[in-house]
Amino acid sequence: MDNKKTNKSELTLQFHAKAMLSDYVTAVTWSPDGTTLAVCSAAGEVMLAAVAAVNELSLQTLQTATGKSADCLSFSRDSQFLAAGGQDGKVRIWRVNSGELIADLDNQRVWVDKLAWSPNCNQLAFSMGRYVQVWNAEDNVVEVTLNFDSSSILDLAWHPMVQYLAVSGYQGVKVWHGEDWDEDPEILSVPSATGAIAWSPQGEYLGCGNMDNTLIVNEWGNFEPWVMQGFPGKVRELAWSDKTNSLGAPLLAAASSEGISVWEKHADESIGWDSWGLEVHEKVVNAIAFQPSTFLLASAAADGQVCLWYEAEQLLQILEGAEGGFSCLAWHPEGQFLAAGGCGGELLVWSQSMGGKDFGLSKLL
């Protein structure tokens, strides 16, 4: 790993603000420009929050509780649009600065639990059973419907640099080329099913968390993937660091049951990847994410703890505030705020400490 380490006291967080939604927080995400936090709930609420310099959250309601879960959120690359999908089978898109609903795409009552904006253009991909549709914001039309065929879609992820769309499900991952949607997708086969998928920040690796308790890392353009085994259950969550080690490779964190493993590329190709475990959580880890530009890893679990791991190795701090457990988390794009959602409707935000003082709802290790 890179020897240039950040001072620990600069990485600790202090309680910043809290708000409450009426039910389980299903997703939380920041706009790419860092000005807005979006959150949604199992009651169907969709809200925007401006994080003020003072300790408060200013919530703007885009959608009130409907009784049907809102499950996924994504901001467009220019931060102008927010998309949400959920149990009612609709994909709704709002203009962020005005809160205006600009599109309401009916998905024929198929639960929409995965959606993502392209980081390269104003295209929105979303799941609809065994299919993925790609909606073009410029023309307000569904550009293409892709047939995964072998099962319902379990995850989808755009390549960060080029117009590739990876889609996972039974028997692996299919990668479509957005320059020509009619071209047959590339297929990355697994004997079981692939759930969570994640491209590394530069797009050279695709991580695949599988239902047979394995993790596969594909180096794009190399047809010999690395297979990691020994997980206690299915690999539920993946997170790449945008900081790289001395080999120029990012770290990959993988959550399975109550444990987290961190994988680092080894200089010896025959070894492939080294790993180590992070074990503090007592219940299922629901979300993991690296702070931008560092190896500081945050993990949120059903045990009511958000843990911060220094250099993705050493427990640095435990954040609390959701007694029924944490369901999701997201770092601000510049890393100075961490937002997390709770199973009881809590929305908590922590901010970087000034000299490591005033920690609010936290424990220092």
Briefly describe each language-model feature range.
Residues 14-18, 57-63, 100-105, 141-146, ...:
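A short beta-strand motif characteristic of beta-propeller blades
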Residues 32-33, 77-78, 119-120, 160-161, ...:
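Residue-level detector of Asp-centered blade-edge/turn motifs that repeat once per structural unit
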Residues 43-47, 88-92, 110, 130-133, ...:
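Short coil/turn segments within WD40 beta-propeller repeats
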Residues 51-54, 96-99, 137-140, 178-181, ...:
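Short loop/turn segments that connect beta-strands within beta-propeller blades
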